[in-house]
Amino acid sequence: HKKETFNPKKSKEVIVKHFSLPAYDNEEQAIEEEVNKIKSNKWIINNNCVLFSKMNPDTKRIWLPVIDNKKLNVASSEFVVMESPNNKINSFIYNICLNSQFIDYLKANTTGSTNSRQRVKPTIAVNYKLAIEDSIVKKYSEIITPYMEEMKILRSEIGKLTQLRDTLLPKLMSGEIEIPDDIEVNNDELSI
């Protein structure tokens, strides 16, 4: 479990990439946020991290973050940050976090009386024991990591396309920009 924190009141950073629960719920798209708008401490994260929400283990919020190497990357303290010694086993850790046995273990060890108030202590998650040989973890990671990296690339592209749509659509709807009449639009395809 990562313990390096970011204090927005003491930071010289102006803008950070913020991995928050609302950002996760918005198609796992971290946001660039002005530090002066951040009210509480965050976790500093890097390429070796996997995030999962400590709230309500039944609601799976597991994130393999797309790190911005040009900015400081921070995660909400509502996430448990699992940091591996290197990013080669992140896909293994990510998939363990999705595993029903791990989720059941977390549910059995939460604090709080109702589903909306249940929390997982980071030490509980870190102390999860799994009897598996290092060679199996290595082989699994060699096979799965390329797919996980592709998933991160596609998620990043989705974010860019969503941003483009959100910029262009209001301008199209208001008439500020128009599609020229000489462009043929195919009704049965998603292309112009």
Predicted regions, residues:
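Amphipathic alpha-helical coiled-coil/heptad-repeat segments
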Residues: 87-88, 104, 111, 127-192
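A short beta-sheet element
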Residues: 43, 47, 51-103, 108-124
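Short, well-ordered beta-strand micro-motif
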Residues: 20, 81-83, 129
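A generic secondary-structure signal for well-formed alpha-helical elements
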Residues: 4-8, 55, 59, 100-101, ...
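Sequence-specific dsDNA recognition surfaces
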Residues: 1-50, 59, 64-66, 74
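Alpha-helix capping/hinge segments and adjacent helical runs
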Residues: 2-6, 85, 191-192
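Glycine-rich, flexible loop/turn motifs
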Residues: 15, 20, 31-34, 70, ...
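Short, small-residue-rich loop/turn micro-motifs
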Residues: 20-25, 55-56, 134, 183
